[in-house]
């Protein structure tokens, strides 16, 4: 296996991860005569063989960062904020980079709009973790980790210091010791400490001892024993080190000690100490649940016996910087060593009061470091193929955990060590550590762990030695005894040298012939504490023995160095005592003679102390070669005989030995498991049928027991996994492979079962252990395949698949079939064994794909699929899914051929079929599982570095593309999924489609129109399900009422839009948070000096508690869970969600663009009449919350789509689509973010351009007006100011700006460039057109129309709460809305009806009636324009006379611009008649009967055309009543007044738009001047603030700006009179209406006047001679009655009349009134009462003589004295003529009055005659001619 090719498939791993010397040179001898030993040595000694393909491949692509996606709202501008923040701080990039995501090495990304959606959906994809969730998933085991799962502790001696000074060398040993059980747990680690002046560079003072421990325990401690040179008699005694008072050695004493230590080779016990390692109150677990603050031996720091001091030291990496390590080290100062006063024993170690031993005045400093003995150790070793002393030396690099393919190896990332340096010594430590990094193996001694010989674990390494512990020798007198120990082969020749089998204490020295113990100085009962390690031979005879020689040495310096004297000998035969664990007592011989072991010789020997057993010792055998169990030894012996064929081949002894293996105790069975399995496999491969079956049955029994006795619950026992994965090598190719024999014997057993034979309970055991045999068969095949092509394969080429022999393959097929049958039958019974067996069969096929011809694997897979075909029970279907998921994870799965040579993708097609069946399954968990499998497989392809080429991605996409077809064929299946499953399917569809080429993709759109529609339904679902919403808006459950079934009930759900795996990832991350600093891993049961590190910081623990509390609550909200996350995790989550939404939208946009291009060439099947696929997806884009990146990519595509398909998209059939697009473009035009807003403007221009070419602009105006109206209810156009008044909002301003920019030719080019469109986008002429129809004037007209509608809506909104109080403003607002939305008849009518209702509430009947007439007019005009009504243009003109607002300007266009849901389709004759009747009713209430008549005349033609005679009768009855009412009004002596009119002027800034404007108000006839003053004061006082007051100007004079005060708002209210159409406004007469003046005229007024008297002499008042008059005529914007109560004064003219003209006018006015009364015709002569009353009233006011009143006052003023001289002659003559005419008419009236009166009025008539005569007499004084005239 030294060649490269074998290494392509298998990796050789060194077996021995420990740096130990070569164990036994005796093993080099020839072992051919002991085949079982050969097996053992080969099992332990050869390198492991690891199949690198077995657990799959996955090479993750380079991690990359997600881009922050910006999702803007109407009032946000995150883009600008981020840009400004970036400008302020350059470090923000580093922060963003820390939130990394999945890489996007998308080779074809240039043709794509965005990154693929899958990485954002699965940002934390963990291939190993996903595989681990498969039922029956096999996970790799690391052998070293699986057997030493506890702790590794390293100890290094730093220094030894005494109060009296360190002069002589000291030696010592350290071992792990269990105080409770009083036993050593490890062998000794030796060290020595030389005085400074005696140090030698070669001494290993830097040595480090490494100890292994299963689990922390309070009783585990370090036992430290110190030795020094045996004390010289009469020399300096060891008591100098323990005296209480300070002792200082003299120079002579120091010299003497140094000389003595050099010549004396023997040592004595000096002191000892016990150092507890762990807390007293900890539990004996393996550490995961231990408290992170558990200290390392608090007794060291606080106990009375060991006043130790702890100092954390920093880890130093090889570059000198502080680094990270899995370990933590402490420096321990042991200040109280116990001096050995006399021989001590284990009991004295337990003595708590230290009565026997004095304390030594010295300090021993140790550095103790712990390491997790985890997977990293072994992997570091195995991946590099060489032994590395990992993490023992802190200067070594960290174990590369990422090399592990085992998910359990992740321990939460690097951990911080303590970085504080506490002393100079710590620096020395670091210096020493650094200096030792060159040869780490030489400086570490791995002490053998005695527990490894008693654990229920297989032996992995070769160890074969005996530990000898001399305990005591009891002599009759005091001596200085010590013992020499040696191993001899026999006792024949006592002069023969012993075997070199004793391990030395010094490192790096070869095995020695003997070793000496300590000297027990002056002892009668000498005790020893030595540990002697003896290397044993591979096999031993009864003559192999240990020989102990006892010496006495004189401890005095004479002429030469002291020589020891032999005292006696003792021997111990190995074969007799090798198994003994208790104390052994031996007699001591005085002399040694040949054959001293033989019983006959022993009788002649002379013994010390009368032959008593005075020598006591202990033995500890540690061997992985020599089984202590007798049955195992018997099996080995019979195996040897069978192999060497020393017995007949049918030997029943071997069968018996094989069968007896089932009775071996579990410990022995486990310890020798691997060699036993190897030997049984050898028998299965090479033995006869009987032997094969026996060996197979024994093997099954052993495997079952191993599975039962191991303490883990895994389906695949870790010991067996290690055997298959590492240890099993199929005999290194030296023997035929195992798999044919194994398959044969197993297959025969299976077939026997299938035939119904009784095969015993062993068969069920075979099934439960089937995974083991299947993996053995596979590895055996793989090894054979590798060796077959070992030498003839060019370097670097893949090993070709191996064609199995027909017989072997048939056997495997039969076996597979039998096992399948078992799965099928047992699944139906619901047995979990069936599921495990199913997974094992899947992995069997998975493995075979690497080894044998895929066609042969196809046979197995198709056999499986035939057995499980179609829809089956949920348990069976789940098994089938698991089977497919396992095989599909294979690297070669895309190449697996079928039976037909053209069928290269059998597996992918069957996978797609079964996944779809899963989605359609009744069982909800199976749906979730099917969807999940799809995503996981796609993730593996997408994120695997080996599949990044474009052709690979295309090939994989083509393989999966039929899945999209399946979905389209069975859409109800998709709709029946819940939201989570839908997302899984859709993300898979998007990923598949993304990597497809256009040729493949177009196939999905070529089959049928319905199928293409369904495809885009899927795209719509993508946009819906992945829409980005705020976390607060998300709901815990999906769209479907049932939640995702794939997750456990306790699994919290942080996000809906991301993969379900993310929830587990975040849950785990939340739990790990608390470990970020000061975790159980970092402070694993070790002392923390810094109390702040003893527990995690508060926020972390609070967050973790909250997360746990939230996850434990049923139905905890996703928002609460998100809040419980660490901010970094929450930021990651939001980033991922933003990206998945953005990437999905961009991907759908990319698909839409492709579709649009294909549709242009008519290559696909779609509805070319409407292009509904494009319209629905575009609408869906707009209606979802999209990222800024999307909008930037969208509008060029939007423009391209309208260029290609403008004619279709702008057709009437797509009105609904256009309306929605227009709505969303206007909505985006409101956005604060300029990038979005400007693109919306471009979108509107694109729509306008298309309308100019493909439709009427009027239709687009109607569309945009409609959408603007709808938008007003969505957008907040006002906001409250601090003074609680409303003002225009930013949204409204931005919309106004956007509508203006739409028509701004100057900004157009820059706008297009900013949005990534060509400069001439708007000028490009579409195909089939020759002229450029783009017109900025048209766009401007459209823009102005929309701005008008916006202003009206804004004005209406700004009224707000004022509307209820200020009914005038409210009505005006409704009116403006009605006019602004006139392009849309429905909206126009809606606002007019609102206005009508408002007027009715105010009882303004005439105005309400006008609204109804206007509505009817809109409908009538539309009907006339369509020529489908009963009316003509003459009727419209008649209606316009009633309501001049009825105009043809808008409605002609609007009737043509019908939009779906709006427009002329709802305008019918019936609705017009309805509103005409409403107007008739309202005019009746207003008593304007002449309007009622006109309206009924418009209704009558309708009934005539329909021959509705009943209705006609009613109409004529109504007309009769109306004309009678008109007659009543005319015959009433009191003139009929329908309304009063008032001029109101507004002056003041608080009036806003009303400031400096005048209005004429139309009020009910009973409203007087005081009433309207009060009403308006009430309205406008509420609008004043503390800085403004309201003032009413009391007169009607002209207001001058300089007269107005700041802070005062003025109202000027004046009563005005309506002016008739033909009235002479220049007449000086006073205006007194009688019935005769307007009886037959329509009461429609648009001019008004009022007269204002004034003087020119400065006086406020004067006589008639000074009284001038100003007549003001006002022209209003429209005519009354109007749609509103007030109209703006557009024109104001004034006339002035002199005082005499005033007087003449007054007289002429009275004359005319009287003459009119005399000449008025009456209906009958008898009807004289009204006339009499009217005549009496006029005469009484004309001829009653009163001082300074009437006619007489005029004469007095102008015809007497000085004023008469000022009159011009013409004026004088006019005045006299007027007076004479007046008197003549009065005389005539008196005569008429006499004819009309009765008796009762005679007295009144007499008064009139007297008054006339008196008046004539008075006037004659001024006008003498009057007497003659009358």
Swiss-Prot record:
Stretches with biased composition (Low complexity): 289-304
Domain DOCKER: 1379-1828
Main location (coarse class): cytoplasm
Keywords: Acetylation, Auxin signaling pathway, Cytoplasm, Developmental protein, Endoplasmic reticulum, Guanine-nucleotide releasing factor, Membrane, Nucleus, Phosphoprotein
Subcellular location: Cytoplasm; Endoplasmic reticulum membrane; Nucleus
GO molecular function: guanyl-nucleotide exchange factor activity
Gene3D superfamilies assigned: 1.20.58.740, 1.25.40.410, C2 domain
Function statement: Guanine nucleotide exchange factor (GEF) for Rho and Rac. GEF proteins activate small GTPases by exchanging bound GDP for free GTP. Controls actin polymerization via the two heteromeric complexes WAVE and actin-related protein (ARP) 2/3. Involved in cytoskeletal reorganization required for cell shape (e.g. trichome and cotyledon) control and tissue development.
Subunit structure of this chain's protein: Homodimer. Component of SCAR/WAVE and ARP2/3 complexes. Interacts directly with ARAC4/ROP2, ARAC1/ROP3, ARAC5/ROP4, ARAC6/ROP5, ARAC8/ROP10, ARAC9/ROP8, SCAR1, SCAR2, SCAR3, SCAR4, ABI1, ABI2, ABI3 and ABI4. Binds to the inactive GDP-bound form of ARAC3/ROP6.
Record-linked PANTHER family: DEDICATOR OF CYTOKINESIS DOCK, LD20667P
Name of the protein this chain belongs to: Guanine nucleotide exchange factor SPIKE 1
Organism encoding this protein: Arabidopsis thaliana
């Amino acid at each position: 296996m030294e060649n490269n090719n074998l290494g392509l498939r298998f990796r050789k791993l060194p077996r021995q991860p420990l740096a130990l010397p070569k164990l036994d040179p005796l093993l080099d001898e020839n072992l051919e005569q002991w085949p079982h030993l050969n097996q053992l040595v080969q099992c332990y000694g050869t390198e492991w063989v690891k199949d690198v393909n077995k657990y799959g491949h996955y090479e993750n692509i380079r991690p990359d960062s997600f881009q922050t996606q910006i999702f803007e709202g109407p009032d946000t501008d995150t883009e600008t904020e981020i840009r400004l923040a970036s400008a302020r701080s350059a470090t923000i990039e580093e922060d963003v980079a820390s939130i990394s995501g999945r890489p996007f090495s998308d080779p074809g990304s240039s043709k794509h709009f965005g990154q693929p959606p899958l990485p954002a959906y699965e940002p934390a994809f963990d291939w190993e973790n996903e595989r681990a969730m498969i039922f029956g998933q096999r996970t790799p085991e690391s052998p070293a980790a699986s057997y030493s799962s506890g702790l590794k502790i390293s100890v290094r001696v730093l220094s030894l210091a005494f109060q009296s000074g360190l002069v002589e060398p000291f030696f010592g040993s350290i071992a792990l010791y269990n105080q409770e059980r009083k036993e050593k747990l490890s062998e000794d680690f030796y060290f020595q400490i030389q005085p400074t002046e005696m140090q030698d560079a070669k001494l290993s003072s830097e040595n480090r001892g490494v100890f292994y421990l299963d689990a922390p325990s309070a009783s585990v401690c370090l036992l430290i024993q110190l030795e020094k040179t045996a004390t010289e008699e009469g020399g300096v005694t060891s008591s100098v080190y323990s005296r209480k008072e300070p002792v200082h050695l003299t120079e002579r004493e120091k010299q003497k000690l140094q000389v003595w230590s050099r010549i004396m080779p023997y040592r004595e016990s000096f002191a000892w100490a016990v150092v507890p390692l762990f807390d007293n109150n900890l539990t004996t677990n393996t550490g995961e649940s231990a408290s992170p603050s558990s200290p390392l031996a608090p007794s060291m720091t606080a106990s009375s016996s060991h006043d130790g001091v702890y100092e954390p030291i920093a880890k130093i990496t090889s570059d000198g910087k502080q680094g990270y390590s899995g370990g933590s080290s402490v420096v321990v100062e042991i200040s109280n060593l116990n001096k050995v006063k006399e021989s001590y024993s284990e009991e004295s170690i337990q003595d708590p009061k230290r009565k026997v031993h004095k304390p030594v005045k010295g300090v021993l400093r140790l550095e103790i470091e712990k390491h997790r003995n985890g997977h990293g150790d072994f992997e570091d070793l195995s991946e590099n193929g060489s032994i590395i002393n990992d993490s023992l030396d802190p200067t070594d690099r960290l174990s590369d955990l990422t090399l592990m393919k085992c998910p359990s190896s992740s321990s939460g990332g690097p951990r911080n060590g303590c970085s504080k340096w506490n002393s100079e010594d710590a620096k020395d430590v670091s210096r020493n550590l650094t200096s030792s990094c060159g040869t780490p193996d030489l400086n570490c001694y791995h002490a053998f762990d005695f527990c490894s010989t008693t654990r229920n674990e297989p032996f992995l390494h070769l160890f074969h030695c005996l530990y000898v512990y001399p305990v005591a020798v009891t002599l009759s007198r005091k001596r200085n005894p010590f013992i020499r120990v040696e191993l001899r082969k026999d006792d024949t020749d006592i002069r023969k040298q012993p075997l070199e089998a004793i391990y030395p204490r010094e490192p790096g020295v070869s095995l020695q012939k003997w070793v000496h113990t300590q000297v027990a100085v002056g002892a009668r009962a000498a005790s020893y504490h030595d540990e002697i390690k003896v290397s044993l031979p591979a096999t031993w005879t009864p003559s192999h023995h240990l020989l102990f020689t006892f010496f006495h040495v004189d401890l005095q310096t004479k002429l030469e160095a002291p020589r020891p004297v032999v005292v006696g000998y003792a021997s111990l035969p190995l074969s007799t005592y090798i198994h003994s664990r208790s104390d052994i007592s031996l007699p001591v011989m005085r002399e040694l003679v040949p054959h001293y072991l033989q019983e006959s010789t022993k009788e002649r020997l002379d013994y010390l102390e009368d032959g008593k057993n005075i020598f006591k010792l202990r033995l500890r055998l540690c061997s992985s070669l020599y089984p202590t169990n007798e049955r195992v030894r018997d099996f080995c012996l019979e195996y040897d005989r069978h192999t060497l064929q020393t017995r007949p081949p049918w030997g029943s002894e071997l069968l018996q030995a094989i069968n007896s293996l089932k009775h071996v105790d579990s410990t022995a069975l486990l310890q020798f498991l691997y060699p036993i399995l190897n030997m049984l496999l050898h028998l299965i491969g090479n033995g006869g049928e009987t032997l094969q079956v026996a060996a197979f049955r024994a093997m099954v029994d052993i495997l079952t027991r191993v599975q039962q006795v191991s303490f883990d619950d895994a389906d695949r026992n870790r010991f067996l996994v290690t055997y298959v994965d590492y240890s099993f090598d199929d005999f290194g190719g030296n023997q035929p492979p195992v798999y044919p024999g194994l398959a044969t014997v197993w297959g025969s057993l299976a077939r026997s079962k299938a035939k119904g034979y009784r095969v015993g309970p062993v068969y069920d055991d075979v099934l439960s252990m089937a995974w083991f045999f299947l993996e053995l068969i596979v590895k055996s095949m793989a090894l054979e395949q590798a060796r077959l092509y070992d030498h003839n394969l060019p370097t670097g080429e893949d090993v070709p698949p191996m064609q199995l022999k027909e017989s072997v393959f048939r056997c495997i097929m039969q076996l597979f079939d039998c096992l399948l049958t078992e799965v099928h039958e047992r699944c139906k019974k619901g047995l979990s064994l069936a599921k495990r067996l199913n997974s094992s069969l899947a992995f069997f096929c998975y493995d075979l794909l690497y080894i044998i011809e895929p066609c042969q694997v196809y046979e197995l897979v198709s056999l499986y699929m035939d057995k499980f075909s179609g829809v089956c029970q949920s348990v069976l279907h789940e098994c089938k899914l698991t089977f497919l998921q396992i095989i599909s994870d294979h690297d070669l799965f895309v190449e697996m051929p079928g039976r037909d040579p053209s069928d290269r993708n059998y597996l992918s097609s069957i996978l797609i079929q079964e996944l779809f069946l899963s989605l359609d399954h009744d069982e909800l968990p199976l749906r979730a599982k099917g969807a999940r499998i799809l995503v996981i497989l796609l993730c593996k392809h997408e994120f695997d570095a080996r599949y990044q080429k474009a052709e690979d991605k295309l090939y994989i996409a083509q393989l999966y593309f039929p899945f999209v077809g399946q979905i389209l064929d069975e859409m109800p299946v998709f709709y029946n999924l819940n939201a989570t499953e839908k997302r899984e399917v859709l993300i898979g569809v998007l990923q598949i489609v993304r990597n497809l080429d256009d040729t493949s993709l177009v196939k999905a759109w070529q089959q049928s129109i319905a199928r293409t529609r369904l495809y885009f339904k899927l795209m719509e679902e993508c946009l819906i399900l992945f829409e980005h919403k705020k976390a607060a808006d998300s709901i815990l459950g999906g769209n479907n009422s049932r939640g995702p079934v794939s997750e456990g009930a306790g699994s919290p759900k942080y996000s809906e839009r991301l993969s379900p795996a993310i929830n587990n990832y975040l849950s785990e991350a939340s739990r790990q948070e608390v470990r970020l600093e000061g975790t159980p891993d970092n402070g694993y049961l070790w002392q923390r000096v810094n109390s702040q590190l003893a527990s995690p910081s508060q926020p972390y623990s609070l967050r973790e508690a909250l997360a746990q509390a939230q996850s434990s609550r049923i139905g905890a909200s996703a928002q609460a869970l998100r809040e419980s996350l660490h901010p970094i995790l929450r930021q990651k989550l939001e980033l991922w969600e933003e990206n998945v939404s953005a990437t999905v939208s961009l991907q759908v946009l990319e698909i839409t663009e492709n579709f649009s291009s294909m549709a242009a060439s008519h290559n696909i099947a779609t509805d070319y009449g409407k292009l509904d696929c494009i319209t629905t997806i575009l609408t869906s884009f707009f209606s979802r919350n999209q990222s800024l990146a999307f909008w930037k990519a969208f509008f060029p595509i939007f423009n391209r789509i309208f260029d290609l398909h403008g004619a279709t998209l702008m057709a009437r059939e797509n009105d609904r689509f256009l309306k929605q697009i227009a709505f969303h473009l206007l909505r985006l035009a409101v956005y604060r973010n300029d990038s979005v807003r400007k693109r919306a403007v471009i979108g509107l221009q694109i729509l306008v351009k298309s309308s100019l070419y493909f439709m009427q602009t009027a239709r687009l105006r109607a569309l945009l007006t409609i959408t603007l109206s709808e938008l007003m209810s969505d957008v907040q156009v006002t906001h409250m100011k601090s003074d609680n008044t409303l003002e225009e909002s930013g949204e409204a301003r931005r919309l106004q700006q956007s509508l203006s920019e739409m028509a701004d030719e100057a900004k157009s080019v820059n706008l297009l460039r900013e949005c990534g469109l060509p400069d001439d986008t708007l000028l490009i002429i579409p195909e089939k057109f020759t002229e450029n129809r783009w017109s900025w004037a048209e766009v401007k007209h459209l823009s102005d129309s929309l701005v008008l509608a916006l202003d009206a809506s804004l004005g209406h909104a700004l009224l707000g709460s004022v509307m209820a109080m200020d009914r005038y403003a409210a009505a005006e607002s409704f009116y403006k809305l009605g006019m602004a939305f006139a392009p849309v008849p429905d909206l126009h009518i809606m606002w007019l009806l609102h206005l009508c209702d408002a007027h009715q509430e105010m009882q303004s009947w005439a105005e309400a009636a006008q609204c109804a007439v206007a509505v009817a007019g809109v409908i009538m005009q539309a009907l006339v324009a369509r020529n489908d009504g009963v009316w003509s243009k003459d009727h419209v003109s008649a209606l316009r006379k009633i309501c001049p607002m009825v105009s043809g300007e808008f409605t002609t266009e609007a009737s043509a611009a019908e939009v779906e849901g709006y427009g002329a389709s709802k305008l019918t004759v019936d609705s017009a008649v309805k509103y005409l009747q409403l107007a008739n009713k309202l005019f009746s209430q207003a008593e304007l009967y002449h309007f009622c008549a006109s309206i009924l005349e418009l209704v009558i033609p309708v009934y005539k055309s329909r021959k509705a005679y009943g209705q006609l009768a009613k109409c004529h009855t109504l007309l009769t009543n109306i004309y009678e009412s008109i007659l009543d009004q005319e015959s009433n002596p009191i003139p009929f007044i329908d309304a009063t009119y008032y001029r109101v002027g507004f002056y003041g800034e608080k009036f806003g738009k009303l400031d400096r404007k005048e209005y004429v108000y139309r009020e009910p006839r009973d409203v007087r001047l005081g009433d309207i003053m009060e009403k308006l004061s009430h309205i406008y006082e509420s609008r004043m603030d503390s800085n403004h007051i309201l003032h009413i100007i009391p007169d009607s004079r002209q207001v001058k700006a300089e007269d107005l005060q700041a802070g005062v708002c003025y109202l000027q209210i004046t009563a005005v009179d309506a002016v008739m159409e033909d009235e002479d406004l220049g007449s000086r007469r006073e205006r007194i209406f009688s019935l005769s003046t307007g009886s037959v005229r329509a009461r429609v007024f648009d001019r008004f006047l009022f007269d204002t008297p004034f003087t020119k002499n400065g006086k406020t008042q004067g006589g008639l001679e000074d009284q001038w008059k100003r007549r003001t005529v006002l022209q209003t914007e429209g005519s009354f009655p109007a749609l509103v109560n007030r109209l703006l004064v557009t024109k104001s003219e004034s006339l002035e009349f002199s005082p005499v003209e005033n007087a003449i006018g007054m007289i002429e006015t009275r004359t005319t009134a009287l003459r009119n009364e005399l000449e008025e015709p009456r209906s009958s002569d008898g009807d004289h009462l009204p006339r009499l009353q009217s005549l009496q009233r006029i005469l009484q006011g004309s001829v009653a003589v009163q001082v300074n009143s009437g006619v007489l006052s005029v004469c007095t003023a102008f015809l007497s004295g000085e004023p008469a001289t000022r009159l011009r002659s013409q004026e004088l003559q006019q005045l006299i003529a007027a007076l004479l005419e007046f008197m003549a008419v009065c005389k005539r009236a008196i005569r008429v009055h006499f004819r009309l009166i009765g008796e009762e009025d005679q007295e009144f008539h007499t008064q009139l005659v007297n008054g006339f005569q008196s008046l004539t007499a008075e006037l004659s004084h001024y006008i003498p001619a009057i007497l003659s005239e009358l």
